[in-house]
Design a protein with these regions (language model features):
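Short, well-ordered beta-strand segments in beta-rich or mixed alpha/beta enzyme
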Residues: 3-10, 40-70
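Residue-level signal for secondary-structure boundary sites
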Residues: 15, 61-63, 99
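Short amphipathic alpha-helical segments
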Residues: 15-39
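An amphipathic, aromatic/His-enriched active-site/gating alpha helix that lines ligand/cofactor pockets
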Residues: 34-38, 56-93
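Short, low-order "capping/linker" segments at domain edges
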Residues: 93-100
Length: 100
């Protein structure tokens, strides 16, 4: 079953349209490529400033390796530089155990 890296970003301190454009045209594709993810999706939590990105991996070992990788650290640094550390994020790995 698939495993997902879910990144939630609180964007209330930045321009939402600029953030959305940057994520759409630059960051999502770059992160998918750097992670070697099967897929990358993103969206907004309704009626909020919370942005969610979801990266799909084949198994937990791959996701955990990415979670601890230098590539992720470099993307985090690039992200923080772009947004002057004004966007707080959480990162979780979700291991899907059942599907119908």
């Amino acid at each position: 079953m698939s495993v997902y890296l879910i990144i939630k970003s609180e964007t209330s301190l930045v321009d939402k349209k600029q953030f959305d454009d940057w994520y759409s045209h630059e960051h999502l594709k770059e992160a998918k490529k750097d992670f070697g993810a099967i897929s990358a999706k993103r969206g907004w939590i309704t009626n909020s400033d919370l942005h969610v990105a979801v990266y799909e991996f084949e198994n937990i070992k791959i996701a955990q390796k990415i979670f601890k990788s230098k590539k992720l650290k470099l993307l985090i640094q690039k992200f923080d530089n772009k947004w002057n550390s004004k966007v707080n994020r959480t990162r979780e790995i979700v291991d899907i155990i059942q599907e119908y």
